[in-house]
UniProtKB/Swiss-Prot annotation:
InterPro entries according to UniProt: YicS_fam
Record's protein name: Uncharacterized protein YicS
Organism taxonomic ancestry: Bacteria, Pseudomonadati, Pseudomonadota, Gammaproteobacteria, Enterobacterales
Amino acid sequence: MKPTTLLLIFTFFAMPGIVYAESPFSSLQSAKEKTTVLQDLRKICTPHASLSDEAWEKLMLSDENNKQHIREAIVAMERNNQSNYWEALGKVECPDM
């Protein structure tokens, strides 16, 4: 009787974690969206010096306001709302380079 009870308790607590687990591709999708946003920002804010993608990302995300606008752009992209996407990117301040 005890093994059955333990199995039921384990199943009761483990199932919500399994059901609500994120898709294995969700992190890939968000990485793709972030890459797309940063590529579009490179078109808007052309860096004078050639920066690596990582340095460019750090530079753009160093400002809290820029982080917020980039998040807004990603949400607009997820919702397939192009006008809000470009509006959010237009609010990003290009850093001095």
